[in-house]
Amino acid sequence: MILPITIYSDEVLRRKAKPLKGIDTSHEELIGNMIESMRNASGIGLAAPQIGLSMRLLIVDLSPVQGYENAEPMVVINPHILAVKGYNAMEEGCLSIPDIHADVVRPSSIQLKYRNEHFEERVDEFSALMARVLQHEIDHLDGTLFVDKLQRRDRRKVQKSLEDIAAGKVHTTYPVAEINQGAKAS
């Protein structure tokens, strides 16, 4: 089932999401719906707050990106970045902030502790695009959006567009949730 994407200015995007204590069939169904919704919106990452749920769950699927065509969707639960290395700037966008793209400086490599779709604990290292997308989605779990990381002059450039989105002037090819709907029960 395709779920509507929560848009900029909705309060759930500004909250620190709650950890999951386990996973059951309802979470498995949710994960499938998140993957379907992300693909429908032509995204490569989606965090639970982006569908109105305050839970520490995210999905990454780089397969639409050239060079990553064989990538499988990755489920990340309760992530915690243990270490970072190097920094670089790269253009980012976000399904919750349609039509805005800007360069964001982030660590180029991370060591991540998380639980997978079977709720098994893992510690892995990620670099390049995967590290960037994971950090972007983890930020969603912490109530941070990529526009919060922009330098002042870049933020000024997109401010009017952000105000338009907050006012509901949004045009997307995917369904969006009503703004300020609040978090749904997890």
Curated annotation (Swiss-Prot):
Pfam families documented for this protein: Pep_deformylase
Enzyme class: hydrolase
Gene Ontology process terms (BP): co-translational protein modification; translation
Reaction it catalyzes: N-terminal N-formyl-L-methionyl-[peptide] + H2O = N-terminal L-methionyl-[peptide] + formate
Cofactor binding summary note: Binds 1 Fe(2+) ion.
A single MF term (Gene Ontology): metal ion binding
Cofactor(s) the protein needs: Fe(2+)
Annotated function: Removes the formyl group from the N-terminal Met of newly synthesized proteins. Requires at least a dipeptide for an efficient rate of reaction. N-terminal L-methionine is a prerequisite for activity but the enzyme has broad specificity at other positions.
This protein's name: Peptide deformylase
Organism field: Prosthecochloris aestuarii (strain DSM 271 / SK 413)
